[in-house]
A protein has these predicted regions:
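Boundary regions of SH3-family modules and the immediately adjacent low-complexity/disordered segments
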Residues: 1-12, 63-90
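Beta-loop motif signature
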Residues: 1-50
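Extracytoplasmic
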Residues: 10-21, 46, 54-58, 69, ...
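Short, surface-exposed beta-strand-loop junctions and turns on beta-sheet-rich folds
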Residues: 32, 65-69, 103-107
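SH3/SH3-like beta-barrel superfamily modules
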Residues: 37-77
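Beta-strand residues in well-ordered beta-sheet regions across diverse protein folds
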Residues: 61-62, 98-100, 166
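Exported/periplasmic cell-wall-interacting domains
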Residues: 65, 78-86, 115, 124, ...
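A structural motif detector for short, solvent-exposed N-terminal "entry" segments of globular domains
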Residues: 76-115
């Protein structure tokens, strides 16, 4: 299925890989000598990574770490595989988040996106984990994604600038029904809309398009 004018291909299912143990050796090609360790946890949550390719005994997975778009081949024996029916498309042009399940759109919401000086990054990412909201203004929870700001390297001395999906942070009026550019790159949703993303599991693909 294709979504919107950007012709995003929406799969019915996405294969996701959960890293077993402390980590798995990552290589630039299947069977090559490892060049990195793909950690079994990131921000104290299990690493659940979308699979983008397979070869006998190997899977190519997206990574949550910088730079954006990172991927690695890891041995299939070091992961457990599952199918994920969800897919998220964030269209910066219409300032909306679209949620799909089994290839069909089930919801879409107006979204607060990055301002021109701190734009929301474009590309293919995924849900890395659900985190506790640091304050009620962030909503019931924060969805940490694998996307990182291209213009901010260290947000509030956190050591990184990760793009998250969370509550409105006081910008409900600005977001309204049409969305708005109000953030430093994160995606802000009205609280009732955010809670509808609760069933989405870690590893769910997120495609951010212009």
């Amino acid at each position: 299925m294709q979504a919107g004018s950007n012709h995003v291909d929406i799969p019915k299912l996405t294969l996701v890989a959960t890293i077993k143990g402390a980590g798995a050796p990552g290589s630039i090609s299947a069977g090559a000598r490892p060049t990195r360790l793909v950690p079994g946890q990131w921000w104290q949550a299990s690493s659940v990574l979308p699979v983008v390719d397979q070869q006998p005994g190997w899977v190519l997975v997206r990574l949550a770490q910088r730079p954006n778009g990172s991927a690695a081949w890891i041995p299939a024996k070091d992961v457990s595989l599952a199918a994920d029916p969800y897919y998220i498309v964030i269209n910066l042009g219409d300032r909306r988040l679209h949620l799909y399940k089994n290839g069909k759109e089930v919801a879409n919401f107006p979204a607060g996106i990055g301002v021109p000086s701190a734009p929301t990054p474009i590309g293919q990412f995924f849900v890395a984990l659900f985190a506790r909201a640091p304050s009620p203004a962030y909503g019931a929870f924060v969805i940490v994604t694998s996307a990182h700001s291209n213009v901010i390297s260290d947000w509030q001395e956190s050591g990184d600038a990760i793009t998250a999906i969370h509550g409105p942070l006081g910008s409900d009026a600005a977001i309204g029904t049409t969305g708005a550019a109000v953030s430093n790159g994160c995606i802000r949703l009205h609280e009732p809309d955010l809670t509808k993303l609760r069933p989405v599991p870690a590893g769910t693909p997120i495609e951010i398009v212009e």
